[in-house]
Amino acid sequence: DPLSSLFLLIITGIGFLIHFYSTAYMHEEEPMHFGRYFAYLNLFVFSMLLLVLGGNYVVMFIGWEGVGLCSYLLIGFWFKNNNYNAAAKKAFIMNRIGDLGFLLAVFWLIVKLGTVSYASVFAAVGQLSATDITIITTLLFVGAMGKSAQIPLYTWLPDAMAGPTPVSALIHAATMVTAGIYMIARSNILYTMAPATQTLVAIIGLSTAIFAATIALKQNDIKKVLAYSTVSQLGYMFLGLGVGAYTGAVFHVMTHAFFKALLFLGAGSVIHAMHHEQDITKMGGLKSKLPITHLTFLLGCIAIAGVPPFSGFFSKDEILMAAYATNPIFYYVGMGGALLTAFYMFRLYSLTFLGNFRGTAHQQEHLHESPIAMTLPLMVLAFFAVVAGFIGIPELFAPNAHALEHFLAPVFAGSTAIAHAHHIEHATEWILMGTATTIILIVIVYAITKFKKYETAEPNTGIAKVLENKWYIDELYDTVIVKPLYWFASVLKNSVEKLVIDGAVNGVGKLVGYGSRQFRLLQSGQVGSYILMMVMALVLFIIIWFNDNTIMYFIHKIF
């Protein structure tokens, strides 16, 4: 159907470009690891295609688990590094928590409706009570929170930067993180009938968008900034789903796939040129040395900042306008996040490409543009980052020009939430759009002016230190969840494992040993003793043989 076919285009289109780019990026790997990398990458794409092509929740779940496994394999691709292995395990475990929610929702559907086929579930949705629908949608959302990195299950995604950069582009742009959006968009009829869950989705999405954007302000690792940017943009998509703008959310998935893949692959090109340096404070002045990377990266930054007529402007604006129609507070908070996005993206751009070079003399000597296999995908993605928005021109500019809305109409036709109860007046929309664009442009100019002459920075203090350390959420999880679990596990190990389980196993062994030692005492080696035993046994046998009835009667009397 239209929704699956749109995701197919995103997955296969961007997946192909990432495969093509990887041939150059991974050329230094040994042949065995080069082959292993592409095997994992293809399995990843296969799992994602299975996820979006399945006609029921079980097939979706199989694809869902497949992308989880492949992300684990790809994040920990360089398995000799223990930090990378830890990041892979973290991603795997965080996703298992979310997957439990998805699995419970599937079981609930089977118990209540006896089917998991989309067509049957949506046709029979009237048989479910309001409580059932709320529980099912909430459990599905827990699954989406894990896969699409929403509060509180988002911490795996920034650590997923441990994998090769093209993997980061594949996970963050085209595939895994959009799976949660796809699932909720696919289940739009269920969510339309669960307003409480929809509000929860909107609030969590908006909170994540702002929260991740604040962390991105103070990150210096080029891939970490883009990772938190992804978490933030996913928050906007969930905001769109939560306010019933399903088309807007899917539109943003598509435009985000183009500009985020572009930014990640651009970052890969920079890291390649800088001999694997990822700290943007040690870069600068790369504009002249990497002209294609610079220009395409700049276009990606403008697109994600939401400057018209680039693609990010149309999709983000559609979500924010729907948010305004639902609750103006959602709009203003979301707009704050958009300003933060513009600021941290142009901080990243300025520190990387403008000003003086701050790296080593060796790096400066060997700076050169990446090979054509890496720059060609950048140019293709840059083209789409600029023009992809035109398939979703808002009604404000031209009535009935929103091609994507017409294309997706059959999928979302059953959801009444799309027709917002109170539509925004065109005059209000013009004012909001004009004001937002003006402020975003001011923020961009401010960020470039502030960071283009950057030399060295003072160590962060106060709130800046907190943002640099990601609000200490990882440390909080470690203290509140991980360490108590370790303590509980050690208690179980020392009491239940050692005393009860090992005690039972070892006790049986000791009992057998003790019994055998007692029987050994009978084997004295004296022939006379053996003859005596044989005679006694023979006498006993004769007595039983001739008195069997009496003995049986006696036994019956006793028992």
Task: Describe each model-derived feature in a short phrase.
Residues 98-107, 300-304, 377-397, 485-495, ...:
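Hydrophobic alpha-helical membrane-insertion segments
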Residues 16, 106, 210, 434-448:
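Hydrophobic core of alpha-helical transmembrane segments in multi-pass integral membrane proteins
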Residues 177, 205, 300-301, 374-388, ...:
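Hydrophobic membrane-spanning alpha-helices of multi-pass integral membrane proteins
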Residues 325-339, 365-385, 399, 411, ...:
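Polynucleotide-recognition surfaces of large bacterial nucleic-acid defense/processing enzymes
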Residues 17-63, 69-366, 370, 384, ...:
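Hydrophobic transmembrane alpha-helices and their helix-loop junctions in integral membrane proteins
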Residues 394-435, 448-559:
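Aromatic-capped, Gly/Pro-kinked transmembrane alpha-helices
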Residues 18-19, 213-215, 348, 442-452, ...:
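Alpha-helical transmembrane segments
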Residues 2-12, 130-144, 333-338, 416-442:
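Hydrophobic alpha-helical transmembrane segments
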